[in-house]
């Protein structure tokens, strides 16, 4: 019985990739527009925009970077009162200077504009 359970556990670990968020270049589109924001723009004013935005995210309260892979970053932002977790992704394509940001709530239909405010704040720090 224990061998069967162990086999099932090991096999099920192959069903889901270790990072189900992005391809590390192109961020997924937002499916539910009410609680997801995805924007991208060309960034020519800052020498290393990915490092700049990474440093800003590292210093943002209640936000923890959980993965960095080259020019891709995945962070989790936790709300102050209800402790909801939102996923924040940043991808930079150095060959085209395109910086992409995606912020999505994990639960609920609406985020009351929190993800848009987060993306706007990150954009404002880049200009």
Stretch-by-stretch model annotation:
Residues 16-127:
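Ser/Thr-rich, low-complexity intrinsically disordered terminal regions
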